[in-house]
Each structure stands twice: as structure tokens, then as C-alpha cells.
Amino acid sequence: GDVYKRQMVEAGRIAEAADPDIIDINFGCPVKKIAGRGAGSGMMRDVPLMVEMTRRIVEAVKKPVTVKTRLGWDEESKNIEEIALRLQDVGIAALTIHGRTRAQMYRGEADWTLIGKVKNNPAIRIPIIGNGDIDSGPKAREMFDRYGVDGVMIGRATYGRPWIFREVKHFLETGEVMPQPSVAERVEIAKEHLAKSLEIKGGRVGILEMRRHLSNYFKGLPNFKETRLKLVTLFDPNELYATLDSIADRWGDFDVSGVIPAPLSHDV
């Protein structure tokens, strides 16, 4: 436990050296190799350790520290209301809550009722950000109206659809649903996305991490199987760019307005 706490404090200091606006501790990650060794949402089984670790990081850095977590470890231990108060007590600046337990992973529907309970607890003074299943402007509006959260966070719905933020903001401001980008626009955005991924992550990781995004950019195009296979197997950036250009050439006239955005993948 102590070594882990020291490592987390050190990680906080390293993160602060990059001069970010905030330092966010992710106690929400449900992936087995993370949670199974007690990290990520595995922390929800050891609340005192979670709180103590957060306290140490808050004390070690000058930047605001925020936390992202889940409702609890499983159905029997939805302890987010207690956790929220205890984390607020040790000085976090905001809390993001994903409306599922660790045991649920990404299955079923996110339960926002507990997020609303935390937000509407008079003892809670910090901003509460809701997360889980937001995939459109209307859905974001519903969550703001129904639960009174201070913000919403969007996760899986961004895969292959980075313009969702523009869509949601537009809907919240105007009440209008934006038209979906054309195939040509998607290709341009995907190329820019790929370039940034390569620049930030390097050749190998930059391409591997783009695969789930690239295949989602073009969900719903007819006769796309072969091209999709290229997007998720090619390793040469030039071949990937050429494949993206070929999509614009071949499907440029396809009307995407009727294509429903990719459903939220549970395979994360």
C-alpha cells in the first residue's frame, strides 16, 4: 500500500510538471488487468486507501485535483455517496461519476439516479459531473435537466465521432440537432486525427490506438467490409492515408444523414 501511495504521489508530480489545468485521478477504470490488481475501480473495495491516496496527491501538487470513479464495486456495495463526501473532505476540486459499478463493466444501462443523489446532497459543494451512455445532444440535455449535474462527460460515444462535442454543444445552445458530417468531411477529420495520433503516440502505438476510431468513423457505409479490414490491419501510415482517400472517392456521394451513429460499444 505505501509503495503504491508513493508511486501515485510521484505520478501526480510528474503530471504537474507538464503544466496541465487539472490532475485527474481515474478510480473508474474497470479493465481487468487494472482493477484486478486493486487499481482503477479496484480502489472501490478499499475506500480508506482511495481517500488517503487522494489526500496525499492533493497535498503534493498545487494544481486542482479531480477524481473520476464509479457507483461502487458491485450491486451490494454502491458506496458513491459516502465516497463523494470523503473525497470532498480531502480537497478534490470536482468529481466525475460513471453510472455503473465495476462489476457491470459497460453492460446494461448507466444508472444516473445515484449521480443525482450525490449532486443534490446539500453537503456536497464541489461540481459533480455525470458520465455514462451520453451519445447525443438530447441525451445530455435530459441528464442536465433531470439530475442537475454541473457537467457531463462523454466517453465511448466519441469513438469515430469526435464531432460529438460540437453536436452536443450546438443542441444545448439552440435545441437543434446538427446534421451528421458527410463522408468527405469524415475522411478529412480522420486524417487529421491519425496525424495527431502518430505525432503524439509514435508509429506503432499511434496506429494501434487509432484502429477502433477509424473503423467507427465509417459505420453504416454499404459494402465496406474489405475497406474496414484495411483500416484495422494496415501498419503503414501512407497506406492508411491512401485508404482514407479512397473512401472519399468511392463513398463520397453516399448520404450519411440516415445513418445512425455507431452504437456505444461495450467492448472497451
Segments predicted by a language model, with ranges:
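Alpha/beta catalytic cores of nucleotide-metabolism and tRNA/nucleoside-modifying enzymes
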Residues: A60-K62, E76-A94, Y106, T113, ...
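Aromatic- and acidic-residue-enriched carbohydrate-binding clefts of CAZyme catalytic domains
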Residues: M44-R45
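Short, small-residue-biased leader/transition segments that mark boundaries at the very start
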Residues: V3-Y4
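Alpha/beta enzyme core
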Residues: V9-A39, P48-I126
